[in-house]
């Protein structure tokens, strides 16, 4: 089960629409279509569940690309990271131009070789990729990953900086990082930390007696969650060292400290908590990385879907509270989509039939956190459009304050969940031409949504 995830990325352009995929078990197969750029991507996990295809909507035959299939022999082998490059395609859109998949045993790719654009890679250890997210339309516009620590471990990002430094450092805190003490001027001379229990770590660096820098002390409030770092590294007095640093919480950014110069680094992670640091130091701070774990939580409960077995499996679990649901309906439920308060959008589920994708758009807005989704109800029945399907024909959504719907007509077999003291944390089911089945993930309102 998925006990907690960290969202990393995405990298790429802003075209297309949001999507996300989270595997029920380990990712075992990835299919991409490539030609000049990455056209589309799809996934299969160890339970046999298959995602939809993300991207590949350009109708021109010469833009379909060539299929490349990656087989991952889970659980002996597991996916741990990705790398690639992004650039303009046809002079208009920024898309994924090359892509590699990194497991604990080998690297698959790169698929396509593109010399220009912006490259991306994630120096990450002690983690398993449990899903993907980003944007797609005609092509794969952007790509990010959901990461989960290897059991009993945190995830290690980095280090960034140079190879020198005689003194390696490595620590994790049992509480939270409270004080950060930096000596900096034209580079990061040294750094030290103190946790909420008063334990001190460092100082790391600062061994040049003629250049100790200027002290800067930053206090992280206990209401903030320290989630990432950013900075630059480059040449300083003949050494490749960290030249500037920023510390990012869920509330604000502390820094930058010193003057940014050289190569920039950042890691866009969400739903995370920094629990420690690692790196190398000597006269200066030569390199730095972070240990990260998901925010604490007990997970969600899976409630089986209502409907039939047509279409393909899908699932969506929110990072935070669900605040928007969009449904197209006309005779049945054609294609729902979801969004949460962190901005994470699901892919549109169903609606594949180009001649019957629902005439009426319905939007449910939920004012989270004062209002939160607690249950769903609806109906499923046979629906005929040339062929006969059993699909979800009506759907309603219940919050702690109100009921929205039912949307579309009431007919045949009804379903509802008489559950209490809970919050809906996500949805799952089956979809193809229409919404064939739908179920929910629930949790108690005061626990995290991940599982």
From Swiss-Prot:
Its main location: secreted. Optimum pH is 6-7. Low activity at pH 4-5 and pH 8-9. Inactive at pH 10. SUPFAM superfamilies: Mannose-binding lectins (SSF51101). Gene3D superfamilies: Jacalin-like lectin domain. Optimum temperature is 40-50 degrees Celsius. Significantly loss in activity from 60-70 degrees Celsius, and is inactive at 80 degrees Celsius and above. GO terms for molecular function: D-glucose binding; D-mannose binding. It is found in: Secreted. Detected in seeds (at protein level). The keyword Plastid does not apply. Transmembrane segments: none annotated. GO terms for cellular component: extracellular space. Hemagglutinating activity is inhibited by D-glucose (MIC=25 mM), D-mannose (MIC=6.25 mM) and Methyl alpha-D-mannopyranoside (MIC=3.13 mM). Strongly inhibited by EDTA, activity is slightly recovered by the addition of calcium or manganese ions. D-galactose, alpha-lactose, L-fucose, sucrose, raffinose, Methyl beta-D-glucopyranoside and 6-O-beta-D-Galactopyranosyl-D-galactose have no effect on activity. Residues 5-149, 154-294, 300-444 form the Jacalin-type lectin domain. The keyword Secreted applies. Keywords: Lectin, Mannose-binding, Secreted. Mannose/glucose specific lectin. Shows agglutinating activity against rabbit erythrocytes. Displays toxicity towards the brine shrimp Artemia nauplii (LC(50)=177.8 ug/ml). Homodimer. Belongs to the jacalin lectin family. This is Mannose/glucose-specific lectin.
